[in-house]
Design a protein with these regions (language model features):
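Beta-propeller folds
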Residues: 1-168
Length: 168
């Protein structure tokens, strides 16, 4: 049981052990220089977004103080080249979690490759979501062009540990 008292105590013990190894002083972790440096890097709003190019868009998963669970967003090449590109939200994980009453953690996406000559298609994706950040995920088919979950005969894998690939 992942949420049992015994399991949570084990996790807390391993976290403490790791913190002692990384930050050997007795001061709180927040006072450690490495902690501050890492936070500065991860929270920098000017960091260059890593993108996946599909069709006419560049896609990026982004987290910040306004999007704690994250948003999946897109922009065009022209916008991406600008100092402050405009992004369009495609999927908001925070809003999804609130709407569904689940503590969703985004675990990635797979673009559905349609085969030779179809490289510009960007509509089909499967998204992996984990409740509470566990190793198990559910996989749902998402239409990026419509910005919504596929409801008619969708690809779906219920919560489990698995690997997914697309074969047409």
């Amino acid at each position: 049981d992942l949420r049992s008292e015994k399991s949570l105590a084990w996790v807390a013990e391993q976290n403490e052990r790791t913190i002692r190894e990384l930050f050997p002083s007795s001061s709180p972790i927040e006072n450690e220089p490495l902690h501050a440096e890492l936070l500065e890097v991860f929270d920098d709003k000017n960091r260059v977004p890593t993108v996946s190019v599909r069709g006419d868009f560049l896609y990026n998963f982004w987290q910040d103080e306004d999007h704690v669970k994250g948003i999946w967003r897109r922009t065009t090449w022209e916008e991406y080249k600008k100092k402050d590109p405009k992004w369009e939200t495609v999927l908001d994980i925070d809003a999804l979690a609130e709407r569904e009453g689940k503590s969703w953690v985004y675990k990635g996406a797979r673009f559905l490759c349609y085969g030779a000559g179809e490289y510009r298609r960007a509509d089909g994706w499967v998204r992996s979501l984990s409740e509470g950040g566990t190793d198990a995920c559910e996989v749902r088919e998402f239409d990026a062009m419509e910005k919504k979950w596929v409801t008619e005969n969708p690809f779906y894998i219920p919560n489990s540990k698995h690997t997914v690939c697309w074969v047409d």
